[in-house]
Amino acid sequence: LQRSFPFHGLQISSFVNSSQTRTDCLAWLGELQTHSWSNDSDTIHFLKPWSQGTFNFQQWEQVQNELWVYRLSVTRDIHDFVKLLKLTYPIELQVFAGCEMHPGNTSESFFHVAYQGMHVLSFRGTLWETAPGTPPFVKLVVKELNLDHGTREMIQELLNNTCPQFVSGLIEAGRSELEKQVKPEAWLSSGPSPGPGRLLLVCRVSGFYPKPVQVMWMRGDQEQPHTRQGDFLPNADGTWYLRVTLDVAAGDAAGLSCRVKHSSLGGQDIYPVLG
């Protein structure tokens, strides 16, 4: 590996009442969405031709069965905790879990749970732990969860063994797409005036892959600290778009440039020209 690759799954579970629930899951390797799992399906859907990685059919079936058991146990546990703690529906639960592979074939895993949008607990090592500032009832939840040795062992196995093994194969199978390099195009313009005697300079960068990029307004060799970066937006072809602005006095615009650094450029930064 030349760089780290995080593999993370997002689970969203909605409990409307004691009989009406739904759980949907999505997974990403880096910035590429690789899997989805609808509440209405018993099977995980592949979003890439290489989404099975190097696992054979039997290995993948075993993982899918373990995750299916996990999904059922989460639903059961939530309903049990509602009764035990006298909680009220509706309940929203989010789980963010996975592992990150680093150069040297090392990995680290993570498993975080949010209740009603608030981070409440995490799985670390072999045990569940409360997050800082959580409601008092979460301590009781953690105590009960830590008594369930079977589920804890299953999560340890998934996080520490299955996930790194699967993700290593996923990276190998998807290497050509993961290592794809697409050069950015960049152009300058001016935006709506921020005020009397002011200019908003806009540097647009588009069509680049992978996502990490550095875009900075410059005066000579000096980075301009008031450079403001917008959100990364996806293009239809899987590349990215970014807008970076600088608010300056009209008389100070001369001599400013926009510098774009990206891995596809081989160290040759680009400086688009206003025009």
From Swiss-Prot:
Top-rank lineage group of the source organism: Eukaryota
Tissues/organs with expression: Expressed on cortical thymocytes, on certain T-cell leukemias, and in various other tissues.
InterPro entries per UniProt: Ig-like_dom, Ig-like_dom_sf, Ig-like_fold, Ig_C1-set, MHC_class-I_related, MHC_I-like_Ag-recog, MHC_I-like_Ag-recog_sf, MHC_I/II-like_Ag-recog
Amino-acid positions noted as binding a D-galactosylceramide in the UniProt annotation, renumbered to this chain: D77, D148, H149, G150, T151
Keyword annotations of the record: Cell membrane, Disulfide bond, Endoplasmic reticulum, Endosome, Glycoprotein, Immunity, Immunoglobulin domain, Innate immunity, Lysosome, Membrane
Subunit structure: Heterodimer with B2M (beta-2-microglobulin). Interacts with MHC II and CD74.
Domain Ig-like: 164-274
GO molecular function, one term: lipopeptide binding
Taxonomic lineage of the native organism: Eukaryota, Metazoa, Chordata, Craniata, Vertebrata
Predominant localisation class: membrane
Compartment list: Cell membrane; Basolateral cell membrane; Endosome membrane; Lysosome membrane
Additional free-text comment from the UniProt record: During protein synthesis and maturation, CD1 family members bind endogenous lipids that are replaced by lipid or glycolipid antigens when the proteins are internalized and pass through endosomes, before trafficking back to the cell surface.
Matches recorded under PROSITE patterns: IG_LIKE
One BP annotation, GO: antigen processing and presentation, exogenous lipid antigen via MHC class Ib
Annotated transmembrane regions: none
Membrane topology reported for the UniProt record: Single-pass type I membrane protein
GO CC entries: basolateral plasma membrane; endoplasmic reticulum membrane; endosome membrane; external side of plasma membrane; extracellular space; lysosomal membrane; lysosome
Record-linked PANTHER family: ANTIGEN-PRESENTING GLYCOPROTEIN CD1D, MHC CLASS I-RELATED
Cited function: Antigen-presenting protein that binds self and non-self glycolipids and presents them to T-cell receptors on natural killer T-cells.
Name under which the protein is recorded: Antigen-presenting glycoprotein CD1d
Disulphide bonds in the chain: C99-C163, C203-C258
Glycosylation positions in this chain: N17, N39, N105, N160
